[in-house]
Amino acid sequence: MKIDYHNMPKGAGMTTFAIRYIMNIVRTWYLFHLKYPWVKYNGFVRVMAHTTFARGMKISIGHNVQFGEYCNIASDVVFKNNILIAGRVCFVGRNDHQFDTVGELIWNSSRGYNGITIVEDDVWIGHSATIVGGITIGKGVVIAAGAVVTQDIQDCEIWGGVPAKKIKDRFSTISEKEHHLRYIKRIQDNKRKN
């Protein structure tokens, strides 16, 4: 087994980091083979305490994906690669309960289709953000803490607010953005070859 030291915190000892890395692999195996067997994963995944994956959802997780504490994944989601998700982030359905049917209580309402949420490569989602189902979060996106994302986000944009809106582009120029997207593609191409 090759341990990836790129993500090692400053000041951490290599031995301690290696032990924690291996323990995480064991914990991930337990989570996705015994506790949440409906979740499919492909690569290194770090799941902090009290994060939950709702039963019956179609959830797939790529390589180098980290979930902070108390995250709640309660909709169909495809997580690609190299994703950081801070604590208390929620992925929720868009149409969990129909509320616009005259003469029917919300409690008794039928459930609508929520769609599949796609989180592309190299995404960072801030603390307590809420992601509504059926959207695509593009490559290289940063989502601010507390944001409520209700629509698709294009590659390399920074979004925040309630509801979330574009704050700015992640990179100053289009050529920097294109260079970064080529870099992401090159990483994925190399991963497929290995």
Q: What are the functions of these language-model segments?
A:
Residues 1-37, 43-44, 82, 97-102, ...:
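Terminal amphipathic alpha-helical/low-complexity segments used for targeting or macromolecular assembly
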Residues 45, 65-67, 143:
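Hydrophobic, membrane-inserted alpha-helices
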Residues 51-61, 66-135, 162, 170-171:
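Flexible, glycine/small-residue-enriched loop-and-beta-strand segment within the central core
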Residues 92-93, 144, 150-151, 167-169:
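Conserved acidic donor-binding loop of glycosyltransferase catalytic domains
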Residues 127-142, 147-151:
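Beta-rich strand-turn-strand
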Residues 147, 155-157, 165:
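Glycine-centered loop/turn positions within well-structured domains
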Residues 152-156, 186:
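Short arginine-rich
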